[in-house]
Amino acid sequence: MQGRIVKSLAGFYYVESDGVVYQTRARGNFRKKGQIPYVGDWVEFSSQDQSEGYILSIEERKNSLVRPPIVNIDQAVVIMSAKEPDFNANLLDRFLVLLEYKMIQPIIYISKLDLLDDLVVIDDIREHYQNIGYVFCYSQEELLPLLADKVTVFMGQTGVGKSTLLNKIAPELKLETGEISDSLGRGRHTTRAVSFYNVHKGKIADTPGFSSLDYEVDNAEDLNESFPELRRLSHFCKFRSCTHTHEPKCAVKEALTQGQLWQVRYDNYLQFLSEIENRRETYKKVIKRK
């Protein structure tokens, strides 16, 4: 039988096949091979009934996220709050870099718009991201049609209202929500488990909130590929390995000078590039000491 893992709990894997969910375990040979089944995996399994089955094999994955481990994702809704906590373009771009690198389609959702006096600033931000090619939503009415026939994960900084949004989309989930701590300005983690839920003709998964995010991109080329607007422009740079920092005849810097590239995104790119280089230097020093 074939199916997809929709939940994992205490060593059991719940596999959905033709609308029926089977409780299964992984064969011991998975541990010997260093393989671990994850939510989202397509698997071959055997089962005598719905409560006692075994996973026999795992199909190749198209992508994966580490925190939490979840695989074969179509798209991700990145929830950013307009206020409390304040909108943070740097953090949003970290999420977008990760998703671009993983080849997961991003959807940007802005929460807590009611806390703003007006939408002038956030409308300007929306226009910039839409010009790059990103889908940008203000309401669940805009978001809901995008969920059909997709596996969607929800992610974002703690306190941005992920669980609140999911409870509005699917009240039957009854996810716990946490308020912002006045002393820390951060939300309490309220999401503890990862499961797929059938919502609006698609499958969604909630993921634990992040107060920070480390992306897996570790070189300039992959970073460039993870910024769509830089990726498009880089074909016109004189040097194929252009980092868009000091090289002559750089199409990215020319676009920036002409106002065709958003300065905020370019500054974040430079910061991420610097972080990559610093990590590399730190790694070299550690290796040298050994």
Curated annotation (Swiss-Prot):
Keywords attached to this entry: Cytoplasm, GTP-binding, Hydrolase, Metal-binding, Nucleotide-binding, Ribosome biogenesis, RNA-binding, rRNA-binding, Zinc
Pfam families xref list: RsgA_GTPase (PF03193), RsgA_N (PF16745)
GO biological process: ribosomal small subunit biogenesis
Organism domain of life: Bacteria
Residues reported in the UniProt entry to bind Zn(2+): C237, C242, H244, C250
Gene Ontology molecular function, alphabetical: GTP binding; GTPase activity; metal ion binding; rRNA binding
Cofactor(s) the record lists: Zn(2+)
GO CC list: cytoplasm
Subcellular location: Cytoplasm
Protein biosynthesis among keywords: no
Residue sites binding GTP per the record: S111, K112, L113, D114, G156, Q157, T158, G159, V160, G161, K162, S163, T164
EC number: 3.6.1.-
Domain CP-type G: 62-213
UniProt-listed HAMAP family: GTPase_RsgA
Its job: One of several proteins that assist in the late maturation steps of the functional core of the 30S ribosomal subunit. Helps release RbfA from mature subunits. May play a role in the assembly of ribosomal proteins into the subunit. Circularly permuted GTPase that catalyzes slow GTP hydrolysis, GTPase activity is stimulated by the 30S ribosomal subunit.
Quaternary structure and partners: Monomer. Associates with 30S ribosomal subunit, binds 16S rRNA.
Protein name per its UniProtKB record: Small ribosomal subunit biogenesis GTPase RsgA
Organism: Streptococcus agalactiae serotype III (strain NEM316)
Phylogenetic placement of the source organism: Bacteria, Bacillati, Bacillota, Bacilli, Lactobacillales
